[in-house]
């Protein structure tokens, strides 16, 4: 392992596992994304977004809003061979967001800019860096580049479903998100004046996931200086409420993880460190790929999809070991001796709770991407 600016890179190159695009809408009018067929037969909506899934964790800076668009060329010029983004003729403007849990980058079309034209054929080309020093192009977190450019053609449908709208980055109350099915089966959460107006048992957003870690990260036991106890007992009704935001602001949001503090001023969380992993914030608002808390969960078993084929699962375990060797130190979250209180993927047992998802992204990652703003869940959002 290494970094291009310091030493030769001794790590596997990045491979594209699949590229997906919006081909339909589900019953709730949300995007349905299917893999682009290598033979170019896929037909996508003109409002489509594109999801690229890789076999390695990426360097967030290479897929950031600043240079990330240059990692993908979508062009109607089928004759031009695209080796670098400079070769991309009349590219469709795209905005990337990175999901480290899934090792995916989603590229959405930029509103107000020229988009996909109905009935037109396009070529999608995934690009690596042009050289070792290039800031753009797909790279792994340790600097290893994309193994080779990948090109797939597709056609845009002549018409869209009438409900199709430009796809936007998800936003909402992901911190206090409630599970509607849970509300429907919880008597105290129903009616105009429920006994529990905050419906504590049905809050399934980021607040619940963070508080699940309070066994090791609380007021009395803030392991590594991190306090995630965001729930407290309301003595007036003898019920818990997710109403504490101070622990996150004081110990997590924008604060460098203790295990990444190296060098001068390393206690200050860095958004664009010269060396990835140095002084990484526990939670970096808007940037899940630079949020150490997610990586501490990723290196544990709760983030591994049990439905993966054996060979893919083994490669993922090897990649997780590379993360741990590079910068994710200490025990994972939760430690092996503790039972998991939530999962990022469905598990074998039906009683194991899976976190909510938003547009293909777990709600903790979605909350960080949306700005990582905690709030008092015991009061409703202002209209």
Regions picked out by a protein language model, each given a short descriptive name:
Residues 2-161:
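Acidic, low-complexity Ser/Thr/Gly/Pro-rich repeat segments typical of extracellular/periplasmic
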Residues 1-30, 40, 47-48, 125-128, ...:
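Aromatic- and Gly/Pro-enriched helix-to-coil junctions and flexible linker segments
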